[in-house]
Amino acid sequence: MVKNSFSSVISQEEKKENGGSVEFQVVSFTNKIRRLTSHLELHKKDYLSQRGLRKILGKRQRLLSYLSKKNKMRYKELINQLDIRESKTQ
């Protein structure tokens, strides 16, 4: 399994202090999404994992929506650093 190096996005000190921050949660959800996506490429009929992936995608989308309403600059930086698409509804 290939590990994604998103530690550059949030430093180790910030992880300890702000484990519940929106950015940290989005990064951890993105790691889970990428891991589940690679799993589902091998196991196409794993419907339980597909359901879990959809739930995590929804959670990440809600957090990104919240962040875009509260602080647009932090939202744009996070989107660019994680290389994920911006939502069409924003």
Curated annotation (Swiss-Prot):
Places the protein is found: Plastid, Chloroplast
Keyword Chloroplast found: yes
GO biological process annotation, one example: translation
GO molecular function: structural constituent of ribosome
Biased composition regions of type Polar residues, renumbered to the chain: 1-11
Cellular component terms (Gene Ontology): chloroplast; ribonucleoprotein complex; ribosome
NCBIfam families in alphabetical order: S15_bact
Protein name: Small ribosomal subunit protein uS15c
Organism whose genome encodes this protein: Cucumis sativus
Gene responsible for this protein: rps15
